[in-house]
Amino acid sequence: MTRKDDIIKVLEDQARTKRENRLKSFKPYPKQIEFCNATADHSEVVLQAGNQLGKSEIGSYIATVFATGLYPDWWKGRRFDHPTRGWATGESTVAVRDVSQRKLCGPPGDEAQFGTGMIPKSLIVGKIIGHGAGGAFDTIKVKHTSGGISEISFKSYDQERSKWQGTTLDWLWCDEEPPMEHYLEGLARLVATDGLAYSTF
């Protein structure tokens, strides 16, 4: 290899590392930081804002730090020092795939882009394919700094409420406002852990 080839390889590796670890370079704006830090004192928090203002982005960021244990220096919000179980939820299976899953894992159905979402690719250790919408995941497994494995499952409001029953969770992320019966079912999943529900819509 020539020196030029070496430089090109280094630049390509740097670009790939940046692409596959968005968490490291993500810089929230003040209102997003305020939302994150509100999780310290409240069991339910909501961020309401207009379209394309970073609601889903910060929602995916919170899910990622909870799943990985990689909290930034500025973080004053809720902390989990153990692997977590959480749900990322939304209006429909397609909406969850195209928004929450995309923000967390990268573009759905494109294996070459898997791991370009908020969760560092190197920390995603498993995925369970869902039923229904092509490219949708049921669950992803993520390495936590404690050494254990966190799980993030994807749920939608168009599922029967019974699909929201029976599981104990540490956190619940509702991206878009949920129907009350689904939200209450989600809150019931948090009782045993004194968990957190956060919503972005």
Which functions belong to the PLM regions below?
Residues 1-201:
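Phosphate/NTP-binding elements of NTP-utilizing enzymes
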